[in-house]
Amino acid sequence: MTRVKRGYIAKKRRKKILAFVSGSRGAHSKLFRVANQQKSRALVSAHRDRLKRKRDFRRLWITRINAASRANGVSYNKFIQFLYKRQLLTNRRTLAQIAVLNNNCFSMMLENILVS
């Protein structure tokens, strides 16, 4: 059998992986083996952090709602409890935006919930 030189396809594959990790430092962007490992680690980290981002934002929203509701004399826990009791189910993201951008509206909403 004749010898087959692995030229074009192998180069294309390596070039694609090296292009993916081109922003890395040192050997991680130059050497193929190290770059290949770096790529797999980068994809694992990206997947993990996409899931973590959801948790982080939820924590941020809860913190903002808690700060705004405590300024009006009610804890976050009681505020959410009153919302469920009145069946006013709005998501935490919207509540946090109202609390940050329009604090007067949040205060009025809180007073209406407490009165009724």
Curated annotation (Swiss-Prot):
Keywords: Chloroplast, Plastid, Ribonucleoprotein, Ribosomal protein, RNA-binding, rRNA-binding. SUPFAM superfamilies: Ribosomal protein L20 (SSF74731). It holds the Pfam family Ribosomal_L20. It comes from the Eukaryota. One of its GO terms (cellular component) is ribosome. PROSITE patterns: RIBOSOMAL_L20. GO terms for biological process: ribosomal large subunit assembly; translation. Coiled coil: none annotated. The keyword Ligase does not apply. It is found in: Plastid, Chloroplast. The keyword Acetylation does not apply. GO terms for molecular function: rRNA binding; structural constituent of ribosome. Binds directly to 23S ribosomal RNA and is necessary for the in vitro assembly process of the 50S ribosomal subunit. It is not involved in the protein synthesizing functions of that subunit. Belongs to the bacterial ribosomal protein bL20 family. PANTHER family: 39S RIBOSOMAL PROTEIN L20 (PTHR10986). This is Large ribosomal subunit protein bL20c. It comes from Cryptomeria japonica (Japanese cedar). The gene is rpl20.
